[in-house]
Amino acid sequence: MSDTEEQEYEEEQPEEEAAEEEEEAPEEPEPVAEPEEERPKPSRPVVPPLIPPKIPEGERVDFDDIHRKRMEKDLLELQTLIDVHFEQRKKEEEELVALKERIERRRSERAEQQRFRTEKERERQAKLAEEKMRKEEEEAKKRAEDDAKKKKVLSNMGAHFGGYLVKAEQKRGKRQTGREMKVRILSERKKPLDIDYMGEEQLRARSAWLPPSQPSCPAREKAQELSDWIHQLESEKFDLMAKLKQQKYEINVLYNRISHAQKFRKGAGKGRVGGRWK
């Protein structure tokens, strides 16, 4: 050993001996401080010195044990948190799976309901189309029957009345002036006296119905023709008045049917048939 090491070793030995003596020596009672005279309080507060806690004698503190217990406690808390986290995560996953299953079930139910509604709507549209077609067929059949009845009634009125209606329908679309109407009416009423082709015997036979007291003359024959034509016109007028009355009655019946149908028709506004029939 060198001189320096020996000197250090000799210095350490008295220090160790002094430390052992201090540990073995009983603690001396602290001297009681005598009460001092009151001093004036300082303007600034005095912070007392920090005194470390005294460790009781005879008890040794094992810091390793404290650290180990603290580590065990932290580990237990961490393990508890991990278990709670995984339980919460498992619960959330179960809820998510249940939510997905509920969504899929709801989606399938909604698709089934939509399919059912589509089928119902298709059936309803088919029924409406069938009902509409049936009504149209009934209306067409009814119109055909009415037309047949009208044609039968018109055919029973006479050939002259039918001819007059045909002429009226043909000339209804063309509007005539007053002069043209007068010329047309006079031409229809005034028939030309054609006797050029008749012989003497035919003229005698034509005038045979006259009374013997009255001589045969062209003016009398013309008056008789005009009288017959007036009778024919009166007959046609009577037939036309009867037909007009029948048409007014049919129009009133149709108007009442339309009004009755519009009252009970669903989803339609108020209808109105124009015109006024007396």
From Swiss-Prot:
Keywords attached to this entry: Disease variant, Muscle protein, Nemaline myopathy, Phosphoprotein
GO biological process: negative regulation of muscle contraction; skeletal muscle contraction; slow-twitch skeletal muscle fiber contraction; transition between fast and slow fiber
Compositionally biased residues, Pro residues: 43-55
UniProt biased composition (Acidic residues): 1-37
Keyword Phosphoprotein: yes
KW Phosphoprotein (keyword) present: yes
Pfam family, one: Troponin
Highest taxon listed in the record's lineage: Eukaryota
Residue(s) carrying Phosphoserine: 2
Signal peptide range: none
Protein name (database record): Troponin T, slow skeletal muscle
Cellular component, GO, one term: troponin complex
SUPFAM superfamilies: Troponin coil-coiled subunits
Job of this protein: Troponin T is the tropomyosin-binding subunit of troponin, the thin filament regulatory complex which confers calcium-sensitivity to striated muscle actomyosin ATPase activity.
Composition bias type Basic and acidic residues, residue spans: 105-149
Family named by the database record: Belongs to the troponin T family.
Subunit comment: Interacts with TPM3.
Gene3D superfamilies the record matches: 1.20.5.350
Region (Disordered): 1-63, 105-153
Clinical disorder: Nemaline myopathy 5A, autosomal recessive, severe infantile: A form of nemaline myopathy. Nemaline myopathies are muscular disorders characterized by muscle weakness of varying severity and onset, and abnormal thread-like or rod-shaped structures in muscle fibers on histologic examination. NEM5A is a severe and progressive form characterized by symptom onset soon after birth or in early infancy. Affected infants display tremors with hypotonia and mild contractures of the shoulders and hips. Nemaline myopathy 5B, autosomal recessive, childhood-onset: A form of nemaline myopathy. Nemaline myopathies are muscular disorders characterized by muscle weakness of varying severity and onset, and abnormal thread-like or rod-shaped structures in muscle fibers on histologic examination. NEM5B is characterized by proximal muscle weakness of the lower and upper limbs, gait abnormalities, and delayed motor development in some affected individuals. Most patients remain ambulatory even into late adulthood and develop restrictive respiratory insufficiency with decreased forced vital capacity.
Gene: TNNT1
One GO MF term: tropomyosin binding
